[in-house]
Amino acid sequence: MKKHLQCGLTAALTLAMLLTACGQKEADANDPPPDAQAGSLYEDFFTGDVTVTANLINAGVEATTASFRAPDVYATKGVDGSDMDWTITRFALLDLDGDGADELVLAIDYSGEEEYVILTCYDGAVYANQIVYRGFLSPKADGTFEWSNGAFDNGASRARFENGVLVYDDFAAMSEGSDGNAVYTLNGESIDEAAFSAFLDEQAAKDDLAWTEFSVDAVDAALAG
């Protein structure tokens, strides 16, 4: 697990939302394309046809936690039996990992803090990865985004998924060197501050992720294309 996802501002909760009627099956020529399959699973998520388990991902260790509950999938606000309030505010569809199927990105108000939940499909199930605000900064239409763990620990990444769990692939970063000075990297190469600043300008100029105000009807319409 990347250190910018660990503890404090960068802790991540991964919810594995396993569809009760879904299972792995062999590919068939008559099967719908991956994006259509994903759309159907996302609709099942919002209609409540899911069994939900909650896992805390921290420092690379996965452990069940009873302190977190999934949102009521029939509404956008309120979680029974929990003192954590979850309100979905907006959403976007975006193929983050380039596999031909869109992820469903939800922006949420989570107990007064803005966070994100990224739904992806794997092996006939929906997986939801919850990321704090500073772990998914300035998301762009090309699937890239920035993260920050402090003044000398920040950068930009692309996402990939391992068994439904989001993993950061950093392609740019600033960190603190052994001498206390900033160290800059881009695409695996060391660069100077000026080049890193130029990269940040280029990243900022990219088209932003297009958000839509959340409602179940709006999600259904977007999934229908």
Regions found by a protein language model. Give the residues of each.
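Bacterial N-terminal signal peptides that target proteins for export
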Residues: 1-9
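C-terminal motif of bacterial Sec signal peptides marking the signal peptidase cleavage site
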Residues: 18-21
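Acidic, small-residue rich beta-repeat scaffolds with periodic aromatic anchors
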Residues: 24-62, 146-225
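Blade-edge motifs of beta-propeller repeat domains
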Residues: 32-85, 125-136
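Beta-propeller blade termini
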Residues: 87-96, 135-145
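Acidic/hydrophobic-patterned starts of short beta strands in beta-sheet-rich repeat architectures
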Residues: 98-108, 142-147
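Structural motif
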Residues: 112-117, 154-158
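Extracellular C-terminal loop/segment signatures of secreted glycoproteins
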Residues: 115-139, 166
